[in-house]
Amino acid sequence: MSHTTCCCSASLGRCDRCDLLIDLEGFHLIAVARRESGLVLDIESCDRLAGCSGCGVIAQGHGRVVVEVVDAPWAGVPARIRWHKRRWMCRERTCQIVTFTEQNRSVCAPRELLGVRAIRWAIRQLRFEGATIAGLARQLGTTWNTVWSHIKPFLQAAADDPARFAGVRVLGVDEHVWHHQDRRRRGPRELTGIVDLTRGEDHPTARLLDLVPGRSGTVYKNWLAERGEQFRSGIQIAALDPFQGYKNAIDDQLQDATSVLDAFHVVKPAPGAPGEVRRRVQQDTLGHRGRKGDPLYQIRHLLRASRHRLTTRQQERLREAFTADGAHISVEVAYHCAQQVRDVFHQDTPTQGRRLATRLLESLPTCPIPEIARLGRTLRKWKDAFLAYFETNGASNGPTEAINGIIELGRRTARDYRNPTNYRLRMLLITAGLDASPHTQL
């Protein structure tokens, strides 16, 4: 169909289908050529009149200037747009503007090498398809520096947009290692990642909010302080791993938020306790490490598994090992204690889960088995954050770990990074951290 704003004569031999194909409102396709480097699309605007930006007087035509920019790939080959710009001359003698050329930012910005469609296509490829800058440069028929220099300003503007932090009610935090080089060359190896865990119509998935150099409570505290009172007052739940530094930052900056200890990190140390007891009892009874044929050594893997997943034969093997020697009673008790910690998160209702958790917090620290008592003291130290799980509908830091997985994949795809600023922008993009900003919605 014809452009609704086009006033060009139908007798000029325009092809409406070609105009529809290039999909540039207000432009006509006037020629197509195929080069070794790809397709070249010649276009011109429909505007036959233009007013001077200085005085508003209708300008006079003053020739053409051809500008070539990189377009998004067409049919799998690189494409270029050759825009035959009209040059205009102001006829008003008192006007300071003598000549000027037409501009249209839907095609390209002034003096840019990549067109708007190419930039939009590249950003979407990075965001959703796991692309790399080098791969995009090959598909566009240009260089790495050209692609990144045009994309980076949009990503930086989106990262600086305060609109990204609107509506955050649930916050998660975790760290990851972004390089394995000398710290003196690239700075801290660890980055603290802050994640929006809010779910709802406007928050379909978790998204990365920021990456901050370092791993400490001070880093997290300073980031929260920089966000402002309005942001901090909106946080209702703050999920975290059992790291006291992050807990101190939450207590200092998010006084009204409920701290929730991640369930995985509650369950994770529990299966290790029976293993420690098994090795100690093994040494006490046999005087050596576990060997093939030793009753306790044969169940070393079963001690770490959930009892609800064991077959009848595996349950029988456990009973045989527990009753093989009177000293094995410590291993059996440790095993059942660890299983109860697992069961906390598998109760029918949150009330039942909290009741079992409270009972374990009271009994485990006084257990005569040292390894279980140590586990109990650790859980008791995090009592409030542990029990808060049952008051917040099972709030978890798990989505934060999922974001870390996306970051790891992005870093492997790019074959490592050297520039921390570029790394932060790329990771924010692929983890939906910039989706809320209009700067990435070209």
What positions do the PLM features span?
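A structural signal for short, well-ordered beta-strand segments and their strand-loop junctions
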Residues: L136, G172, A239, S259-D262
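Short, conserved DNA-binding cores of transcription-related domains
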Residues: M1-I97
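RNase H-like nuclease fold core
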Residues: T146-A239, Q244-A249
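A structural micro-motif
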Residues: F27, A257-T258
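Glycine-rich phosphate-binding "P-loop"
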Residues: S9-L12, N104-E112, H203-T218
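Short, positively charged, Gly/Tyr-enriched micro-motifs
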Residues: G56-Q60, V66-L171, E175-Q181, R232-S233, ...
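Acidic/histidine-rich catalytic cores and adjacent linkers
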Residues: S45, G54, Q60, P188, ...
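Short, surface-exposed amphipathic charged segments that create phosphate/polyanion-binding patches used
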Residues: R186-E190, P271-Q283
